[in-house]
């Protein structure tokens, strides 16, 4: 049995399309420290994308997995948790029934992340990469959805979400794999149709690189002969094109055998490459850059790290005067305490005040002539750990 730890211990459970994962975390000197990690395969995505529903037997399996995780949470002395579900649960026609069963059987409240929220969490992590440029295309490629966003002048300038992903594509084309030429032709047509909206919205904009996060990127980088740069995996466009051309002559069974991949990964590798290939084509980007991004650790940070710390880090990244921002924050906290009998505002509002103090100079580099408006625009479109949309707007205002 694991020993209970000193300090706050939290857990994050992720009910995904292929696996049910749980991590146990604690705040450490370098940020979030993972104490334990569990992963059990469960093919929710295959079931939902094929039938539209989650079967009763699968709900039982899921409930059993979560009971085991609850025991681990108890052993570690977890005091706060967050349980999320993504694309498969989001698209299940009977998701309300499934969530209700988990609440009754497991006493667990599961939050279904919508497309935009899932993408925003990933973008917040991608924006911390040292490989981010002044103007970059950010992307999140999931099992059933793809998110894209343009990062410009310290904020997300344009974003869109597509209801397509590599697992969903794989399920849609199941049965075509043996007809190799037809399979790839239909695959490319599907991907091109879904990305038409992206091409129209980008309106000819080009980028030198795409910063992205997604499943199996380590497998793709290894297959394509990618390299590591500043902690990120980098795949050149030429490498990806060469690998895609090689795969076009193989079916999934041959790919698994020749590339020494599992059958599951071999099934999904062609849709993955087709999506990345289309993104590179639309943007004329020369490379894919995949910094280490972990959605569960991002959510754990929300539970463990104070929002004002995240705001301070964001201000530093934007080039604000950190010492000045800290002085403004200190004065704000002092005045808040002295005037508490008059204003009667709660402690949560103090956190928002600290965030506003730390971020008030955020717009200086973006627009010297109208710093206030620039700061407002940057903050309202940002994601700050620990704050919801309404609280972020209050900070911006």
Predicted features by range, described:
Residues 7-10, 24, 47-76, 89-98, ...:
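Helical "lid/coupling" subdomains associated with nucleotide-phosphate turnover
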């Amino acid at each position: 049995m694991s020993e209970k730890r000193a300090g706050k211990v939290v857990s994050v459970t992720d009910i995904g399309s292929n696996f049910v994962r749980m991590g146990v975390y604690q705040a450490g000197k370098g940020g979030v420290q993972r104490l334990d990690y569990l992963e059990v395969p469960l093919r929710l995505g295959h079931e939902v994308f094929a039938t539209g529903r989650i079967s009763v037997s699968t709900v039982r399996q899921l409930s059993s997995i979560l009971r085991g995780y609850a025991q681990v949470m108890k052993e570690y002395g977890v005091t706060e948790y967050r349980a999320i579900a993504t694309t498969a649960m989001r698209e299940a026609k009977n998701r309300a029934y499934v969530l209700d069963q988990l609440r009754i059987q497991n006493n667990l409240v599961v939050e279904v992340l919508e497309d935009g929220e899932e993408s925003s969490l990933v973008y917040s992590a991608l924006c911390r990469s040292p490989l981010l440029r002044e103007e970059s295309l950010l992307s999140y490629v999931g099992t059933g959805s793809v998110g894209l966003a343009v990062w410009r002048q310290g904020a997300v300038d344009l974003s869109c979400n597509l209801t397509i992903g590599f697992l969903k594509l794989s399920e849609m084309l199941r049965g075509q794999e043996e007809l190799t030429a037809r399979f790839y032709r239909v695959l490319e047509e599907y991907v091109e149709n879904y990305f038409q909206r992206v091409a129209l919205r980008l309106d000819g904009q080009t980028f030198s690189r795409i910063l992205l996060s997604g499943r199996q990127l380590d497998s793709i980088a290894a297959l394509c002969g990618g390299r590591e740069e500043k902690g990120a995996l980098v795949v050149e466009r030429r490498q990806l094109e060469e690998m895609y051309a090689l795969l076009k002559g193989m079916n999934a069974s041959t790919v698994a055998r020749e590339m020494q991949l599992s059958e599951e990964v071999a099934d999904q590798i062609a849709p993955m490459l087709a999506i990345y290939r289309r993104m590179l084509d639309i943007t004329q980007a020369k490379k894919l850059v995949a910094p280490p991004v972990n959605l569960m650790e991002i959510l754990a940070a929300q539970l463990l790290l104070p929002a004002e710390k995240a705001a301070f880090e964001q201000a530093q990244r934007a080039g604000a005067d950190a010492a000045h921002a800290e002085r403004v924050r200190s004065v704000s906290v002092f005045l808040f305490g002295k005037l508490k009998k008059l204003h009667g505002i709660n402690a949560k509002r103090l956190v928002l005040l600290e965030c506003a103090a730390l971020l008030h100079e955020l717009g200086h580099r973006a627009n010297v002539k109208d710093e206030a408006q620039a700061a407002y625009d940057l903050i309202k479109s940002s994601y700050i750990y620990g704050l919801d949309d309404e609280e972020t707007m209050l900070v911006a205002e």
